[in-house]
Amino acid sequence: MKALVKEKAEPGLWLMDVPEPEIGPGDVLIKVLRTGICGTDLHIRSWDGWAQQAVRTPLVLGHEFVGEVVETGRDVVDIKAGDRVSGEGHLVCGKCRNCQAGRRHLCRATVGLGVGRDGAFAEYVALPAANVWVHRVPVDLDVAAIFDPFGNAVHTALSFPLVGEDVLITGAGPIGLMAAAVARHAGARNVMITDVSEERLELARKIGVSLALNVADTTIADGQRALGLREGFDIGLEMSGRPEAMRDMIANMTHGGRIAMLGLPSQEFPVDWARIVTSMITIKGIYGREMFETWYAMSVLLEGGLDLAPVITGRYGYRDYEAAFADAASGRGGKVILDWTL
């Protein structure tokens, strides 16, 4: 089968012929239809410091996908050939304290699809049945391909009650944009999103945010005033991983404000802990998706009319992967999709 492979410990990817994956008794073999390109894939392609520490070559990349089941192991009883499916990209041990308590997203031994084991940038991918999400109602293929990052957005945005709240989102990348759509759909009063990319801020305006603010020339405090806020934001969703974004968010929260932090900083950085303490601000780290409550929430949101179409801005056949990755790395658009049927 064809697959995008990190063949060598150096920058680049290689489209290669590799053996089709074999499945065990509890596994599912899936014919991949479409995949989404994630920031993680960009890191592995560029072979930065994180990738050099996390990845062992050769490796098939990719963890965002939608496909069709073609074969199931003998112990799989609730998934059948022909099912349209996506996959939870975090494979957990099932034995630790958190796994046994049903908190699988907190497993200390998590292995990432397309990072710690061969992934979905291929014509076929194999997964444990416990990681397979069957789409019981029709979902657009492009949207189904990005259920993994959509889940990150949903997990972050729904960490705290949103109805009637004023929400600040720092970072208008694809996950930030999806979080903004979720916040609006879930009943937030105001949703302000910040970035330095006018192209991405324009996407945010199409989603329907209250204010899309370019922090290269306007402060968050100015945005507050434009929205008529007197005491700061109730909810903060930090999606950028930028130190200055987190510091500005803390400075613009109301007393008792709550922050969900998905953005992953590249290094340690100082924050105003005195402000956090005296303003009684709650900060919650977010990683991945709750299994499978977040997946249920995603399906319900889409059934309820949530529109993610503006977030998907690039579509390519898998053989045009170089152009697709360049598009995804440009920082100017939303999600980029690879079609494995072309």
Curated annotation (Swiss-Prot):
<feature type="binding site">
    <location>
        <position position="195"/>
    </location>
    <ligand>
        <name>NAD(+)</name>
    </ligand>
</feature>
<comment type="function">
    <text>Catalyzes the NAD(+)-dependent oxidation of L-threonine to 2-amino-3-ketobutyrate.</text>
</comment>
<feature type="binding site">
    <location>
        <position position="93"/>
    </location>
    <ligand>
        <name>Zn(2+) 2</name>
    </ligand>
</feature>
<keyword id="KW-0520">NAD</keyword>
<feature type="binding site">
    <location>
        <position position="63"/>
    </location>
    <ligand>
        <name>Zn(2+) 1</name>
    </ligand>
</feature>
<comment type="similarity">
    <text>Belongs to the zinc-containing alcohol dehydrogenase family.</text>
</comment>
<comment type="pathway">
    <text>Amino-acid degradation; L-threonine degradation via oxydo-reductase pathway; glycine from L-threonine: step 1/2.</text>
</comment>
<keyword id="KW-0963">Cytoplasm</keyword>
<dbReference type="InterPro" id="IPR011032">
    <property type="entry name" value="GroES-like_sf"/>
</dbReference>
<dbReference type="InterPro" id="IPR004627">
    <property type="entry name" value="L-Threonine_3-DHase"/>
</dbReference>
<dbReference type="GO" id="GO:0019518">
    <property type="term" value="P:L-threonine catabolic process to glycine"/>
</dbReference>
<feature type="binding site">
    <location>
        <position position="99"/>
    </location>
    <ligand>
        <name>Zn(2+) 2</name>
    </ligand>
</feature>
<dbReference type="InterPro" id="IPR002328">
    <property type="entry name" value="ADH_Zn_CS"/>
</dbReference>
<feature type="binding site">
    <location>
        <position position="107"/>
    </location>
    <ligand>
        <name>Zn(2+) 2</name>
    </ligand>
</feature>
<feature type="binding site">
    <location>
        <begin position="286"/>
        <end position="287"/>
    </location>
    <ligand>
        <name>NAD(+)</name>
    </ligand>
</feature>
<dbReference type="Pfam" id="PF00107">
    <property type="entry name" value="ADH_zinc_N"/>
</dbReference>
<dbReference type="InterPro" id="IPR013149">
    <property type="entry name" value="ADH-like_C"/>
</dbReference>
<dbReference type="Pfam" id="PF08240">
    <property type="entry name" value="ADH_N"/>
</dbReference>
<feature type="site" description="Important for catalytic activity for the proton relay mechanism but does not participate directly in the coordination of zinc atom">
    <location>
        <position position="148"/>
    </location>
</feature>
<dbReference type="GO" id="GO:0008270">
    <property type="term" value="F:zinc ion binding"/>
</dbReference>
<dbReference type="GO" id="GO:0005737">
    <property type="term" value="C:cytoplasm"/>
</dbReference>
<dbReference type="InterPro" id="IPR013154">
    <property type="entry name" value="ADH-like_N"/>
</dbReference>
<dbReference type="InterPro" id="IPR036291">
    <property type="entry name" value="NAD(P)-bd_dom_sf"/>
</dbReference>
<feature type="binding site">
    <location>
        <position position="38"/>
    </location>
    <ligand>
        <name>Zn(2+) 1</name>
    </ligand>
</feature>
<feature type="binding site">
    <location>
        <position position="96"/>
    </location>
    <ligand>
        <name>Zn(2+) 2</name>
    </ligand>
</feature>
<feature type="binding site">
    <location>
        <position position="200"/>
    </location>
    <ligand>
        <name>NAD(+)</name>
    </ligand>
</feature>
<keyword id="KW-0479">Metal-binding</keyword>
<keyword id="KW-0560">Oxidoreductase</keyword>
<comment type="subunit">
    <text>Homotetramer.</text>
</comment>
<keyword id="KW-0862">Zinc</keyword>
<feature type="binding site">
    <location>
        <position position="175"/>
    </location>
    <ligand>
        <name>NAD(+)</name>
    </ligand>
</feature>
<feature type="active site" description="Charge relay system">
    <location>
        <position position="43"/>
    </location>
</feature>
<dbReference type="GO" id="GO:0008743">
    <property type="term" value="F:L-threonine 3-dehydrogenase activity"/>
</dbReference>
<feature type="binding site">
    <location>
        <begin position="262"/>
        <end position="264"/>
    </location>
    <ligand>
        <name>NAD(+)</name>
    </ligand>
</feature>
<dbReference type="InterPro" id="IPR050129">
    <property type="entry name" value="Zn_alcohol_dh"/>
</dbReference>
<protein>
    <recommendedName>
        <fullName>L-threonine 3-dehydrogenase</fullName>
        <ecNumber>1.1.1.103</ecNumber>
    </recommendedName>
</protein>
<feature type="binding site">
    <location>
        <position position="64"/>
    </location>
    <ligand>
        <name>Zn(2+) 1</name>
    </ligand>
</feature>
<feature type="active site" description="Charge relay system">
    <location>
        <position position="40"/>
    </location>
</feature>
